[in-house]
Amino acid sequence: IPKEDVYRIDFDFTYEEGTSRVGILLNNDLKIDAGYGYFIEPLHHRVVFEQFPIFPQYSFVSVYLERPLHLKPNELNHVCVIVQDTVAVCYINDTVALSTRMYNYNTQKIGLLVQGKASLSNIKFKRFEKGE
């Protein structure tokens, strides 16, 4: 995906009791195990945006944002993430939004992850052309 492009990722998910994270990785670099991610953390009733690796001590390059989010196990949820250059916005169930910027890594690689048990469905990726 060229840097100037805008893209959107949508997916639905349900999770089982005890699941700690359902997330989407953005601009991840497998060679150095670094990137960004939006992570839904049902046990903590929040959605977070993190840059990884997470440094054990404070660092000016550390990024951490969060919003409260109350979901229930075994209920259908929808996630939409829109990325334009360095800007990313995550919408959950059209009720919670979390926006950020991503400056340090720009690999344009994405991924989905689950820590626990969850079902992901209706996974869609759309790249927007200029003027769309």
Each model region followed by its residue ranges:
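Extracellular glycan-recognition regions
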Residues: I1-E132
